[in-house]
Amino acid sequence: MFSVISPPHRAPTANPTPGKPDTDSVPPLGSGAENRLPKSEPKQSRPDLATLTALRFVAALWVVFFHLQAMQHTFLAPVYELFRPVIANGDLGVDVFFVLSGFIITYTYLDRLGPRFRWRAAADFVWARFARMWPAFALVVGVVGLWFVYGTAQETVREWSLQTQAPDLSPWGLAKQLLMMHLWFQPGTDGASWFGPGWTVSAEWLAYLAFPLLALVLFRLRRMHPLAALAASVLTLLPTAIWGPDLPIPTDGHQPYEWLLRIACCFIAGAFACIAARNADRMKFNPALAGPGALLTGTAVVIFLATAGKPGPGRLAVLAFPLLIGLLSLTRGWLRSALSAGWLQYGGRSSYSLYLVHMFFIYLFYWLIRDWPNGAGPLVENLLATACLLGIALATHLLFKYVEEPARLRLRALVPRVGAARVARATAAVGHSSRGGGRP
């Protein structure tokens, strides 16, 4: 998803979540004095964390392939045979997004929002998040709404949505969707959104609204030793990692408001991982070790998922995500260069759009196959699968290039940013004084 930051300078380019935070042009973490993030004052000019942008694309593809299992009997069959245990745990890609969101939002905004609560700064942050998330989401909600108008003339809402619970299509249901509040009123995620994975947008929007208050606490912990912060990150994830079906603390099915525990644990864990990464210089961490460490951690996650074999026990892998993200943020050398490839960067920047559009094409594929005259043979299934994959790629590009980014820039331009307004006032004051209009 999904999931879902505009500094007072150039437009940012990175964004982890289906709710998709961007990096506000953030610098490499823990890379020495020249790149060190101030502990109490924000820097205003920062390069992108390209490695995390690439990770966002990988996480989005993980979720997409998890949902594409309806096509596992097409030409994609070899992919699913080879990576079945990993793809079966594709819902963990959502947790990657949530942890990334906490990490990058904290890295970008902690020093702006943390020292003390200011309504203007908090409002600027919330508006930046709204401008990033809402336009593309609202458009997809509208398209899916038309899809329901067409389909429910023949099928029930529940059947047409391909969910176990029917989403609310009433005017109030539409209002909840457009306000991105649709998950807040439900104990479970199924049926909360008009399209399955849309629940993550609502969850992440709630996390963003809470962050200005959370930042007040995190700012007081910003000088934690990196090992202590990393330990806090892992401990924060324990409730969502060990409690559930087929986990060390087993439950009978999913529990009410489990989604709230999931977003809270992952987002806060990402925040602590950020504190650990930005303080890495305190333990004289060698950035040259970050790349190999990230590769080792990622490999360990894949091996663990392949061994676990099913989504229940595989959920324990979430405990490794803070370490993986922290190490990637510190990565230098060839791995950073490889992850900075243009196609990975574009995929990461457009990952929110990919997350939003892909499910619609899966719906199309399912219903076309089901209602195909005289049944769809292998050739038809392969052709439809190819068309749907191409449609996903094209729709992602169009939504990102012509809706998500332009709408974000226009909405941000409607409200002057705190930093920009301050600079404008200072410039006006200097100009006034230089013209002799000020007091001597």
List each language-model region with its residue ranges.
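Juxtamembrane/transmembrane-helix interface segments of polytopic membrane transporters
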Residues: 144, 148, 152, 274, ...
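Acidic, glycine-rich loop-and-beta core segments that form the ion-binding/anion-interacting portion
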Residues: 250-258, 262-275
